[in-house]
Amino acid sequence: TTTVVNYTAKKSYCRRAVELTLGSLGVSSELQQKLQDVVIDRNALSLGKVLGEGEFGSVMEGRLSQPEGTPQKVAVKTMKLDNFSHREIEEFLSEAACIKDFDHPNVIKLLGVCIELSSQQIPKPMVVLPFMKYGDLHSFLLRSRLEMAPQFVPLQMLLKFMVDIALGMEYLSSRQFLHRDLAARNCMLRDDMTVCVADFGLSKKIYSGDYYRQGRIAKMPVKWIAIESLADRVYTTKSDVWAFGVTMWEIATRGMTPYPGVQNHEIYEYLFHGQRLKKPENCLDELYDIMSSCWRAEPADRPTFSQLKVHLEKLLESLPAPRGSKDVIYVNTSLPEESPDSTQDLGLDSVIPQADSDLDPGDIAEPCCSHTKAALVAVDIHDGGSRYVLESEGSPTEDAYVPQLPHEGSAWTEASTLPVGSSLAAQLPCADGCLEDSEALL
């Protein structure tokens, strides 16, 4: 008998094929040359689910095969070719060519560029970047504020985000690189919660919500653009400083849209008449002074990124150290108030939301009373002990119920400083089981 062996020849990397594919994109020979050492073989990249999609393109999850080792999880940015000219494709890839040599912990690193042929045999460019577990900073801030179970983000962490961005922008400005699109949406959160500056002009090809087209001028993120850039379309490092100030405001407000109530087409007149972003609620005066310095009318009067980094680091160092090694967790729920006519007994299951049922019950005070009227209770759980802050409708009265303190020797005090959190109509009583003085962070 004759043995038949079927096999598939191993695919080899063909430089000539890559050159032809890049050339078919219609980009310049100079750009083709720049991209040669970052081109990724399409067979090494597998695409997964769509992470984000917009008018002009999408971001997909992917896996990049490594010569040795396990595949690397990546993010892949693509363009919708039917919306773009060859010039815009060249701009898309030019940004990738610019960042390929960046090497800084607070600046995203380009992994490569991949060219894929569509079913119509049209070459489609894809930019491959590291996958960021927590996504972009703006989305993270929004989730922390608006999700069903909001996550408390301490002021120290917010300031650390700002310092990270300042470090990244200091590096870019030292290399005479203009970002021109700095915003919280264009900063990414690594697995260790450090921030890296990203999307050097790539985001406007994919996300269009924050961009505004005026006449025949290309879409611009006008609420982040410096006043001189709006007037004359002139960009300098000091224009990036202006955008950094707006980004600081975004972080301080945990993802709010700048200039609430002001339309895109009204921004220039608003700024021209001396108006600026208002101080966020519960923002430290020192922090607002730093961000305000970024919005001075004369670019030369604005600080450098090196100066901003120093100011922010000093402010961060002046704040009290975190109280525990673990992140502060806040559980917001409603506890019934005392009612003399009710003897209903509530267990812990009715106090702890389902999402937080794995918390140690010993760290949460069990309610000892009930009433149809609810009071908002914020429970701060950390390594050093537990704090209980109660907020009820109206002002406290003399006969108001005072909850039992969690530890012997604890006493009710008035919170006098609230560096982070929502505005409060009145000071709240707080019970602290810690032996030393501390602040209530809401």
From Swiss-Prot:
GO terms for molecular function: ATP binding; transmembrane receptor protein tyrosine kinase activity. The keyword RNA-binding does not apply. Residues 45-316 form the Protein kinase domain. The modification Phosphotyrosine is found at Y212. GO terms for biological process: cell migration; cell surface receptor protein tyrosine kinase signaling pathway; phagocytosis. It comes from the Viruses. GO terms for cellular component: host cell plasma membrane; plasma membrane; receptor complex. ATP binds at L51, G52, E53, G54, E55, F56, G57, S58, V59, K77. Keywords: ATP-binding, Host cell membrane, Host membrane, Kinase, Membrane, Nucleotide-binding, Oncogene, Phosphoprotein, Transferase, Tyrosine-protein kinase. The active site is at D181. PROSITE patterns: PROTEIN_KINASE_ATP, PROTEIN_KINASE_DOM, PROTEIN_KINASE_TYR. It is found in: Host cell membrane. Pfam families: PK_Tyr_Ser-Thr (PF07714). It is an enzyme of class 2 (transferase). Its EC number is 2.7.10.1. It catalyses: L-tyrosyl-[protein] + ATP = O-phospho-L-tyrosyl-[protein] + ADP + H(+). This protein is synthesized as an Env-Ryk polyprotein. An Env-Ryk precursor fusion protein is first synthesized and then cellular protease cleaves this precursor into gp85 and the putative oncogene termed gp69 (gp37-Ryk). PANTHER family: TYROSINE-PROTEIN KINASE MER, TYROSINE-PROTEIN KINASE RECEPTOR. Belongs to the protein kinase superfamily. Tyr protein kinase family. AXL/UFO subfamily. This is Tyrosine-protein kinase transforming protein RYK. It comes from Avian retrovirus RPL30. The gene is V-RYK.
